[in-house]
């Protein structure tokens, strides 16, 4: 098992136990499902606080806590972590953290970092692709600029040998339709097929219809649960409903014949996927499980040892606060690790 925090490979039982977020002291019991929805709403609200973000991102404690979930702030940091993950049998999707840039200069700087990433991935022969947000590429500033910038990255990925891949992340519901339209548009460009993909959130009520349209064109999908604050008329509010829809959509993806990513740390859902794959004679290399950097590393390695494909979503950069809050919203059990890091200050 590799230690994603400092690129060490822990060998002691203590290190291994520390990596397993399921190993909690009795005084920190697993959060009951009836309280998970409340905590989820709380962390989503906190993710939108500009004041808390400014305080957290400039505090020593905040930076220490974020190191569990974020590879570092520099390009060299993410490249070292990616190489370590590859050596542990994991593929990677790299995300340069950021969203909702406010000017064209920020947007151009963001896309330039992604061009450098693609160059370094190729030069170092890393098994990694890139994930990005359209608002980080300037969608709020100039939609045409954002489209041109991402189109350039997809064209570059498609021209590489071996070909690489660009995942366009999903953001809040205000961006859902524009994001999907853009992915469809990029996919239809000659030579881009298989080099650009979308993200579908199972808590969105519209997701089944979106999945059907994406599958009709053979567009690769990452399926996740969703971690933005949305009203009941747009998104499912109960965890049980979100999980049930995830499983329903997951089976559609697995039977489609295209290569998709199942992004979850939920062992019940993972076991359901494994059982379904066996029952339907779906090969283990026909899809991949996707997990977040710093979360359930024991499970990542267990799946790899069983012969399943696992991709780790590894972010880097200084704008980590919204990302961390959304990870706590998705999995309130991660709060134990945050508390432990603060106490170890």
Region locations from a protein language model:
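Low-complexity, intrinsically disordered or signal/transmembrane-proximal segments
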Residues: 2-4
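Positively charged, amphipathic and often flexible ligand-engagement surfaces
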Residues: 27-345
């Amino acid at each position: 098992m590799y230690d994603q925090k400092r690129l060490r490979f822990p060998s002691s039982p203590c290190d291994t136990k520390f990596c397993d977020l399921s190993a909690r002291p009795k005084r920190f019991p697993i959060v009951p499902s009836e309280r998970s929805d409340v905590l989820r709403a709380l962390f989503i609200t906190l993710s939108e606080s500009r004041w808390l973000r400014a305080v957290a991102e400039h505090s020593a404690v905040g930076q220490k806590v974020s190191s569990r979930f974020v590879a570092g702030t520099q390009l060299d940091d993410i490249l070292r972590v990616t190489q370590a993950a590859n050596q542990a049998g994991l593929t990677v999707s790299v995300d340069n953290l950021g969203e909702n840039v406010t000017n064209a200069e920020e947007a151009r700087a963001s896309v330039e970092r992604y061009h450098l990433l693609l160059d370094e991935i190729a030069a170092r022969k890393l098994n990694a692709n890139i994930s990005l947000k359209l608002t980080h590429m300037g969608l709020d500033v100039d939609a045409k600029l954002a489209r041109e910038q991402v189109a350039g990255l997809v064209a570059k990925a498609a021209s590489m040998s071996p070909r690489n891949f660009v995942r366009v992340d999903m953001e809040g519901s205000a961006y859902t339709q524009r994001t999907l339209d853009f992915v469809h548009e990029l996919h239809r460009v000659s030579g881009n097929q298989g080099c650009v993909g979308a993200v579908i959130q199972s808590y969105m009520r519209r997701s089944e219809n979106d999945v059907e349209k994406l599958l009709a064109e053979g567009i690769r999908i990452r399926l996740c649960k969703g971690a933005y604050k949305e009203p009941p008329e747009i998104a499912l509010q109960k965890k049980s409903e979100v999980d049930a829809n995830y499983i329903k959509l997951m089976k559609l993806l697995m039977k489609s014949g295209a290569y998709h990513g199942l992004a979850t740390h939920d062992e019940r859902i993972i076991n359901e996927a494994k059982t379904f794959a066996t029952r339907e004679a779906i090969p283990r290399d026909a899809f991949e499980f996707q997990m977040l950097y710093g979360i359930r590393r024991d499970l990542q390695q267990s799946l790899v040892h069983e012969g399943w494909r696992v991709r780790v979503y590894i972010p880097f950069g200084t704008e980590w606060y919204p990302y961390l809050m959304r990870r706590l919203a998705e999995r309130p059990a991660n709060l134990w690790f945050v508390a432990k890091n603060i106490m170890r200050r």
